[in-house]
Amino acid sequence: MDLLELRGKLDQIDEKIVALYEERMEISSQVADYKIETGKKVFDKAREEEKLAKVRALTHNAFNAHGAQELFEQIMSMSRKLQYNKLVQAGSLGRLPFIGVDRLETEQARVVFQGAEGAYSHLAMQRYFGEQVKSFHVDTFRDAMTAIEEGSADFAVLPIENSTAGIVSEIYDLLVEFENYIVGEQIIRIEHCLLGLPGTDISQIKTVYSHPQSLMQSAKFLASHEDWKQVSLKNNAFAAEKVSKEGDRTQAAIAGEQAAKAYGLEILKRGVNQAENNSTRFIIVTNQKIFRKDAGKISICLEVPHESGSLYHILSHFIYNNLNMTKIESRPIEERDWEYRFFIDFEGNFADGAVKNALRGLRDEARNMKILGNY
């Protein structure tokens, strides 16, 4: 039998496979109708494991057993997605516990940020809410999350990611711990400046203060001043405030231009951070389960079983529903060695059918899924 004949036989088999697949999906559709009527869950892990064991047993060698399992995992995954889609169309998913609003009520809002006046968080707050907003600052990110949870603030402004230094891992952990939700974001271009008392010459400086990340981002500039002592503080604005209050010309701070204005300091040198394209993304957080009706990004977190292929199957919900995943991060789960929680950003709105479909599948098949916000 030549190659052409062999390919012809494969084509005939493939036609039968496709016909059987469509027949199977029609029965899956009927299963979905039954589950809509009875309220039975789509995902039945025990049933699927039993089915896969039977499929493996039908094969004649280990290679085919592995391949058959992969094939039927995909078939059953598509069956579930069909069922989720029918549940969405039938309105059986219920609405998400978030209320859509035309705009955020910010006129009388109280906003909290971590740091001090002149910090980048302060600037992000002013850009998002306006300079006349009622605001106060706290020492830690946890304090900010507590303020909105307890009601002393309506919104918090928190840095979640820097384009050069990466994520602010503490913020991710706090989003899991607190029942607070993301409703907006603000991106601020970062330009670190060397600040000193008015009239100070750079040659007078002996000590420079700043946040550890800012010192790291300015490493190239600082390397040209090896005799300077570098001291880390928890916020750039605190560094500027310290230099201003102590009145010592041998001290300088690395912070933004807004900190110089806030504390009456002189900019001794601009752009001391080596990366020109350096930005920080800030999130706007509230304790209300709301989202803007024109929101276009969704953030969630979830855990997956510690087994082969589990993350792959979870991510397939984004592919099937044609949702663009823009970010995925992992964080270790406390007290569970080598297990991770995944944070995912993707494009969409809670009102979209594809989003509802994906979220239902993720809720059923992942562990401890939490919606962090639509903004």
Language-model regions, residue ranges each:
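Domain-level signature for soluble enzymes in the chorismate/prephenate branch of the shikimate pathway
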Residues: 1-375
